[in-house]
Design a protein with these regions (language model features):
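Charged catalytic cores and adjacent phosphate/nucleic-acid-binding surfaces used
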Residues: 1-15, 19-27, 32, 46-49, ...
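Conserved beta-strand positions
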Residues: 39-42, 107, 140, 168
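Short beta-strand/loop segments at the ligand-binding rim of alpha/beta enzyme cores
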Residues: 60, 101-106, 110-111
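Short acidic/polar active-site loop segments enriched in Thr and Asp
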Residues: 35
Length: 230
């Protein structure tokens, strides 16, 4: 019987708007027992590349190269890519570009909206486009505080789609790492990809401790454009 692994597939570093460095993220993920992580900084893969290099030299943790792409229609996470995906394209073109690299396209927090205007407009999730385009998976557990309703909507959407369900912390601070996670058969990136492609993943979530919520609030006050309006 294959031992189950645990992955966090949505994380940010100082390469975009996260507080932890790639090295800190790797060390912390290792310390809490994760087997695979995907570093998915906004519109860059530099953090992921640095994290992967550090993990290979210093730990047994596996790092999937990822990117949270700011498409014209909302954020899309690319997994298993080798080159940066250009932001600003339509969601359809973004998914196509990800697949062109042999990557997997994930509809993350598909129903999250914000009232604050950002570089990519006011839409942060692709919404019902998750059902219309060829996404490989849907993020149904996101550990951002206040996302309960958004997660429930994503779960209901995915029940109809039958796509692989993923959990990703959307961590911007170390306290968030692993708070939402994906369980899969195996403990390697290859096994994880197989699980996503065959729909054998299970998404889960853990509650924050009080101090973690306080730190997240502090991060939010410094990054108002990324705070969800609930």
């Amino acid at each position: 019987m294959v031992s189950p692994g645990r992955a966090d597939l949505h994380m940010h570093t100082t390469a975009s708007d996260g507080w932890p460095s790639p090295h800190q993220l790797v060390e912390h993920a290792t310390s809490i027992g994760l087997h695979v992580i995907a570093v998915t900084d906004h519109d860059t893969i530099e953090g992921a590349l640095r994290a992967a290099e550090h993990a290979e030299r210093r730990t047994k943790l596996h790092v999937v190269i990822g990117e949270e792409v700011s498409s014209r229609d909302g954020h899309i996470v690319a997994l298993y890519i080798e080159r940066r995906i250009r932001p600003g394209m339509t969601a359809a073109a973004t998914v196509h570009a990800i697949h062109d690299q042999g990557g997997l396209a994930v509809a993350v927090h598909p129903f999250w909206r914000t009232q604050r205007r950002t570089r990519s407009g006011r839409v942060h999730g692709v919404g019902w486009l998750a059902a219309e385009l060829e996404f490989d998976a849907v993020e149904v557990e996101n550990a951002t505080p206040g996302f309960y309703v958004f997660n429930q909507l994503a779960r209901r959407l995915n029940m109809g789609l039958g796509s692989a369900e993923l959990g990703g912390s959307d961590a911007h601070i170390l306290d968030a790492v692993g708070r939402a996670y994906t369980v899969f058969p195996g403990r390697t990136p290859k096994a994880l990809r197989t699980a996503i492609e065959t729909g054998t993943t299970v998404a889960g979530r853990q509650r924050y401790r009080a101090m973690g919520l306080m730190r997240y609030a502090a991060w939010g006050l410094n990054h108002e454009r990324y705070v969800a309006v609930v």
